[in-house]
Amino acid sequence: MHHKVNVKTQREVHFPMDLLQACGASAPRPVARVSRATDLDRRYRCVLSLPEERARSVGCKWSSTRAALRRGLEELGSREFRRRLRLADDCWRAICAAVCTGRKFPSFSVTDRPARARLAKVYRMGRRLLVGVVCRGESVVSDLKQECADLRRVIFEGSTRIPSSSLWGLVGVLGWTSPERAMQLTFIGRALPYGSPDVERRALASHAATLSIPAECHPNYLVAAEQFAKSWADDNLPRKFRIYPIAVQESSCMEYSRAQGGLLQSFRKGFVGYDPAAPSADPDDLELAKERGFSRIRASWYSTFRYRGELKSTNQSLEARVAVVPERGFKARIVTTHSASRVTFGHQFRRYLLQGIRRHPALVDVIGGDHRRAVETMDGDFGLLRPDGRLLSADLTSASDRIPHDLVKAILRGIFSDPDRRPPGTSLADVFDLVLGPYHLHYPDGSEVTVRQGILMGLPTTWPLLCLIHLFWVELSDWAPARPNHSRGFVLGESFRICGDDLIAWWRPERIALYNQIAVDCGAQFSAGKHLESKTWGIFTEKVFTVKPVKMKVRVRSEPSLKGYVFSRSSAFSCRMGGKGITGIRAARLYTIGAMPRWSRRIRDVYPGSLEHRTASQRYGEPVTVYRFGRWSSAIPLRWAVRAPTRTVGNPVQSLPDWFTVGPAASSVAADSNAFGAVSRVLRRMFPGLPRKLASAGIPPYLPRVFGGGGLVKSTGLTTKIGAVASRRWMSRIGHDLYRSRERKSTLGRVWTLSTSPAYAASLHEVEKFMDRPDIILTRKCRNPMLKHARELGLFEEVFESRVGGGILWASLNGKALVESHSPSILQVSRNLRRSLACPSGGFLRPSAPIGKLVQRHTLPRGTVWFLESSATDSARQGGMGLPPPPPPPLGGGGMAGPPPPPFMGLRPESSVPTSVPFTPSMFSERLAALESLFGRPPPS
């Protein structure tokens, strides 16, 4: 179809940001901003009523689109028609967000024939989306999501030029045929609207069908899993179970819904008479309060919530409700709601397991939240990856729902068979009961299912156990046949990183195949089209990167090696950079050709084999090709840009306005991906008028949130000068906080948090009182205050945050709301910021100071906190006379004295649970035969 365009009045058309305009309708009038529903209602009533010649901004056949919409309105009714219209509009906004990331916003000259052809494709794409969703339903959205997955698969397969017809022709319209630019379009799939009711129903049906099917693992896997867990616990977990502060949430539980107060209301009803210590209390009092709280939690498992709550039967503690949570990406997540006591007690196990998980090199950066550093350090100490390896980006479907119970029990048995690693008064059967149940699930449609496989997403222990099981699969994949990857015989590095069910690994093809086999044997199912292998591209937790080949010279030196069961030979090498001479020699490290999992290498103690001593010799080879980390993709996530987030991090309940949430979301994405230019362009197009709204309320829109500003992003990023985004009054207060206050931190950012959480505000006030006490000393990091009775409490940030977080329970039990019942107004936040700007001692900042340097100073460690013991303070108060201090308060106060709690009701005794058998030399032949039967071949030697 040829478009008739009046070139005298219209010479250029920009990419349409409005879906109806993309179908050829007239552009929306510049009226005052209204709500989303009202705006859509006005738009579609306008375009349906106007004559064709008036409802057209450029030459386009609008009449057929309007007729299809009218038919859809008559067939569906007004309510369903509007829902589908909003669904299509959200899909188009996801496409527009990806388009806005480009350096130049696309426009089409109507005097150029190729440009008119590209514009016609835009109109066809908009009509396909709008009319398809309204008339055919949600299958069009699923097709768009599959197109994004197919485009990513094409990029990972190594294509150097992407076909122009990809993603409904959008690649050709924009001219983004390079893999780097086309990668941004694949993030449209994760930014699609929330899952619809049909998506939720399908997710619930799949969840019930999966959990109701019993599954078992091969016995050889169970033996290996228990040995792995026991070795991992011995190497990483503390010898004794630790007690942690009670986690406070307003999430729903079996006793109380979220509207009724949730888990916090259960604390108030169950902890009657419990008086926790205030955040300003002495360190010893806080430790005693934690022990008292843990005792109440342990007692609540069998008494408090079963008899004082709404659950009347002891068996009902294994009851759980199923809830569906729609997510962006047109999908839905299934979660479960459990009794408050089990959730609270499970958090103790979760934090104990995380103490050991964070010590593993593949998980330490992930637990710390630095996923980019986790990937960048994959190439190890040498910066080398074997040349015959491939990047595996694993993606599992319903990973936690498909894990067999016997495999989970083997892992738990290996970890908690030692009584010292369990909470006082608990048995191994109690651990099984807490983690696995078996739980009886109640679905929203009234159906009921007893769980026969899988670990539920509503329990705190699920994610740590998923990490351990995934780590077990990875370690077991070391059984794959190893081979030299060079004629000289040396073996370079392999590496991997884990985050729950996400895996990124650089492995030889044999190990990838064995990992896939092990995971499938243990019940896993890989996502079709998302479980990717590539020689160049990798993706880990939605962060895309590349690796690059590098040629290096390698020196090989033979070493004495262990012969026998597994180890046949090993090599050590050091590398020299080529080019203009030698730039450095790296330290040598042994790499084994025949590899075993680390947890199995203890076999050397019982089967030492024989050592063959040789005279070390050195050989130099030609430069070989190895791989290193390349660079991060410039693509950014788009979920935050489609619609303003309604919640902030750490505040999962309260609904907040866009001026409150867009700034932190944009700053987080820009800082994580170092793409300040792309984020600023998306902000300017997707949220027009937001900077003006913040500035009119007296809030600097482009000042970081830690300094009290709106948190929006400029294209200059961290190099932006403070004088360009803040007035002298703001710079004076920020300079005082950073350079003249005791904390050396800006306190303006707390105003935003205090406006949403009264409990946080009360806890923060108590901690500030504690830090101002005369017996609290702040020194530089690793410095001693040179006082005899000073006790180190830790770094300032750790002490401050732990006391504030632990004090939220104290504030909540004393009547403070965890979150405000209403959203804060912009005028309220503005007034609080103006009051906080008062600075009695003044301050100074150069207007040319970069924002990045100021943020860096704000995040610097502030030193070590020391506490003067009571003997020192009493001696000081009494003039140095050295009188004895008053006696300490008796232990067990607060009504906690009494006999120990009875054993848990309805649980099996510990003696009935099989325990792990220690590995002995007599078991060697049986173990070898079992492994041969499992893999169909003898282990590599």
Swiss-Prot record:
Superkingdom of this protein's organism: Viruses
Source organism of the structure: Saccharomyces 23S RNA narnavirus
Catalytic activity: RNA(n) + a ribonucleoside 5'-triphosphate = RNA(n+1) + diphosphate
Region (Disordered): 875-918
Subunit (UniProt): Forms a ribonucleoprotein complex with the 23S RNA, where a single polymerase molecule binds to a single viral RNA genome. Since the viral RNA is not encapsidated, ribonucleoprotein complex formation appears to be the strategy to survive in the host as persistent virus.
Remarks, miscellaneous: Yeast strains also contain a double-stranded RNA (dsRNA) called T. The (+)-strand of T is identical to the single-stranded 23S RNA. The T dsRNA seems to be a by-product of the viral RNA replication cycle.
GO molecular function: RNA binding; RNA-directed RNA polymerase activity
Descriptive protein name: RNA-directed RNA polymerase
Lineage of producing organism: Viruses, Riboviria, Orthornavirae, Lenarviricota, Amabiliviricetes
Disulphide bonds in the chain: none
CC annotations in GO: host cell cytoplasm; ribonucleoprotein complex
Keyword Ribonucleoprotein among record annotations: yes
Keywords: Host cytoplasm, Nucleotidyltransferase, Ribonucleoprotein, RNA-binding, RNA-directed RNA polymerase, Transferase, Viral RNA replication
Function of the protein: RNA-directed RNA polymerase that replicates the viral (+) and (-) genome.
EC number(s) recorded for this UniProt protein: 2.7.7.48
